[in-house]
């Protein structure tokens, strides 16, 4: 079983970063990292279904959702497995990521290994936006940067 994973985020613009994932036994996954080049504020942060970046971040498909649920926030019962909420960039354009999540995993049915991590243009409304798009994407807008999550040492 993989206990560590890493993802290098890249996009067409200035946004880039490195995200580390670590899981002990059947515990939560600890997600830590740094993303630079962002506009100040909140940005949706999701694991998407496919590890396919052949056409940039668009070929990563929808949010990773093996349980066929509606989009939600990381604390919600009704959420995609890949819904990790938002990262927040300061005035310097840097988001320091520190998330602990019990739904994603580095093994088994909810494994995120080989899938794509995406940082979005806009804040994720956590499924509370009152329209259909909110229940799918959280109205998080375009995909600024992405990368495939791979097994790490």
From Swiss-Prot:
PROSITE patterns: SOD_CU_ZN_1, SOD_CU_ZN_2. It comes from the Eukaryota. The modification Phosphoserine is found at residues 98, 102, 105, 107. One of its GO terms (biological process) is relaxation of vascular associated smooth muscle. Its EC number is 1.15.1.1. It catalyses: 2 superoxide + 2 H(+) = H2O2 + O2. The modification N6-acetyllysine is found at residues 122, 136. This is Superoxide dismutase [Cu-Zn]. It comes from Cavia porcellus. The lineage of its organism: Eukaryota, Metazoa, Chordata, Craniata, Vertebrata.
């Amino acid at each position: 079983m993989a206990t560590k994973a890493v993802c290098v985020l890249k996009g067409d613009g200035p946004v880039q970063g490195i995200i580390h994932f670590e899981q002990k036994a059947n515990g939560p996954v600890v997600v830590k990292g740094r993303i630079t080049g962002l506009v100040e504020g909140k940005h949706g942060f999701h694991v998407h279904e496919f590890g396919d970046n052949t056409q940039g971040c668009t070929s990563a498909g929808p949010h990773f959702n093996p349980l066929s649920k509606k989009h939600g926030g990381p604390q919600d019962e009704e959420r995609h497995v890949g819904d990790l909420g938002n990262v927040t960039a300061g005035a310097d354009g840097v988001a320091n990521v520190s998330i602990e999540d019990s739904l994603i995993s580095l093994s088994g049915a909810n494994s995120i290994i080989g899938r794509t991590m995406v940082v979005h243009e806009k804040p994720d409304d956590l499924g509370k936006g009152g329209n259909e798009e909110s229940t799918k994407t959280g109205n998080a807008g375009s995909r600024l940067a992405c990368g495939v999550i791979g097994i790490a040492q």
